[in-house]
């Protein structure tokens, strides 16, 4: 895992629903925790593009549902600013289910992947068809 050059707006708090953008069998995910989050008292933990979160599978195949798994956020609706000054935003909030080491469990990623997530996680960039 590498560091990021841009400032990512952390716009996905606990309870946020995400689209699962891989072929693991999960369709909809809910953020339940953010890994390595240290915040203020009474503030909801939140995450942004390229961060690893723990999710609960809400919709999907019966084998995948009700499981708690780590995932990497690859897209977010809230715009964020890159180091070169451009602003980026996507159509939806999406994540990819991964192993605890950070390698994707699926063999395919649907839709674009943010450049920040691809740079930080080489396993995700290997499966991405579009890096935006």
UniProtKB/Swiss-Prot annotation:
GO cellular component, one term: cytosolic large ribosomal subunit
Gene Ontology MF term list: large ribosomal subunit rRNA binding; structural constituent of ribosome
Keywords: Ribonucleoprotein, Ribosomal protein, RNA-binding, rRNA-binding
Biological process according to GO: translation
The keyword Chloroplast appears for this protein: no
Iron recorded as keyword: no
Pfam families: Ribosomal_L14
The name this protein goes by in its record: Large ribosomal subunit protein uL14
Origin organism lineage: Archaea, Methanobacteriati, Methanobacteriota, Methanomada group, Methanococci
